[in-house]
């Protein structure tokens, strides 16, 4: 852990059965942070042992949803400046150097938060491909002004939201260097994640009272395949990108079918209850 920076940084990572990837994530942040917090949702593999061996502070917490888990991990950080990465991500050496330079030169408070470019790394790749897709995410921020806990009406859309009284115009900076986001370890892992994540998303949609049209249900998978493969540029991964785009599109389709299933069950319960009351009144 880096003890030389005047303004300390806490890193936090949430995990569940990430024994094959958590070391890479921790090693990419431990040299630029004062502490690394790992909140583990009851892994059954060696995730906890690996994290502890690398010097991380591990806390076991039953699953609260993506937003709840990250909010809890954030609350454990002792420093105002916090850095969040997922277990399947890694800060490049260049990004580590950039962050360290900003904090060592006492320039971090010019902004309230920093965005990171997350380059998608296919599971079979050793280095980023040219024109690889990427996402821009706020991952380094001062938690006095922003937090994952500000996310409402969702347990899955985990993003850093500024406090309502904070004027953040011009106060977010996109870092020059990138981090790497590694895709699933296997087709099986991607499908398992798609099933789990679509369950969580469907629950959110039910809570939000979302309605579903037959048109959207029948076109959802086609649209999201097009978006993943062409707009998000998964075509740079060739056949593997084609396969992953189908799985991604299927996950989006699944969340709607599960929303529909939940809606039908609710209607059946209401109809059954109405029928029972009618029989009682006779």
From Swiss-Prot:
It is an enzyme of class 2 (transferase). InterPro entries: Glyco_trans_2-like, Nucleotide-diphossugar_trans. One of its GO terms (molecular function) is glycosyltransferase activity. It holds the Pfam family Glycos_transf_2. Its EC number is 2.4.-.-. It comes from the Bacteria. This is Uncharacterized glycosyltransferase RC0292. Keywords: Glycosyltransferase, Transferase. Belongs to the glycosyltransferase 2 family. WaaE/KdtX subfamily.
């Amino acid at each position: 852990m880096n003890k030389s920076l005047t303004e300390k940084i806490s890193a936090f990572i949430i995990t569940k059965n990430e024994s094959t990837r958590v070391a890479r994530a921790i090693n990419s942040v431990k040299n630029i942070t004062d502490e690394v917090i790992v909140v583990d949702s009851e892994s059954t593999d060696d995730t906890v042992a690996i994290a502890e061996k690398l010097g991380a502070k591990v806390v076991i917490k039953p699953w609260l949803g993506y937003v709840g888990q990250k909010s809890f991990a954030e609350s454990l950080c002792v420093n105002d400046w916090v850095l969040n990465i997922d277990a399947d991500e890694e800060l490049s050496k260049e990004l580590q150097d950039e962050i360290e330079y900003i904090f060592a030169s006492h320039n971090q408070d010019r902004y309230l938060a920093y965005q990171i470019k997350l380059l998608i790394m296919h599971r079979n790749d050793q280095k980023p491909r040219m024109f690889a897709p990427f996402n821009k995410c706020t991952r380094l921020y001062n938690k006095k002004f922003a937090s994952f806990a500000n996310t409402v009406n969702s347990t899955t859309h985990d993003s850093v939201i500024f406090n309502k009284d904070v004027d953040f115009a011009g106060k977010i900076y996109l870092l020059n260097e990138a981090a790497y986001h590694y895709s699933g370890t296997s087709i099986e892992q991607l499908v398992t994640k798609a099933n789990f994540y679509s369950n969580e998303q469907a629950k959110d949609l039910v809570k939000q009272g979302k309605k579903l049209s037959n048109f959207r249900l029948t076109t959802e998978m086609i649209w999201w395949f097009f978006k993943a493969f062409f707009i998000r540029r998964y075509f740079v991964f060739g056949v593997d990108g084609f396969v992953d785009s189908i799985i991604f599109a299927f996950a989006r389709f699944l969340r709607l079918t599960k929303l529909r299933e939940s809606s039908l069950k609710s209607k059946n319960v209401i109809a059954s209850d109405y029928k029972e009351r009618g029989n009682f009144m006779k």
